[in-house]
Amino acid sequence: MTNRLSFEMEKDLLIKGWMSHDARWFMAVAERFGIDAANRLNQLVCRELGRVEMKRYMKTLGLSPAKDLEEFLILGKAALTLYGSGLAEYEIKTLNHQTYEMHLKRCFAYENIVRAGIKDQYECGILARIQGWIDAQGLEHELAPPLGKCMMVLGKECRYSITLHFH
């Protein structure tokens, strides 16, 4: 074979493959057990996946948990680039020494639930994954608003305020 994939092409294919698996898993659970069960399990699995992938990421790079918001945001942005490249467009705004706001301007999950025709029943799993990244660092946090229905479906901007409690 003469054509070789670049690293970015390989990463893109792996991410898209995983997201295809994720969507099909969600729909299979929804069809078999109902949308409420699919939402509950999706949030649980996304949070646990986030915890595991952040622990693995930190171990691979020899990193310790973040000591302050600046370190946390640097680590989070790097993880988003690795695990979610091209899946969302977002802005991060620091509100104070322990709180930041995440504004998702474009979200693959929203785009896919609209295509799948389940937008009115879907509950956000994206922020659950980020909560897992927080859990992996042993941090307590507050999320406002709490997870629930997709904010974009509700006609709102997808904005979450996350307050971290560093030790």
Where do the model's predicted regions map?
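N-terminal accessory segment detector
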Residues: 1-99, 108-124, 140, 145-167
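A conserved amphipathic terminal alpha-helix motif
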Residues: 122-135
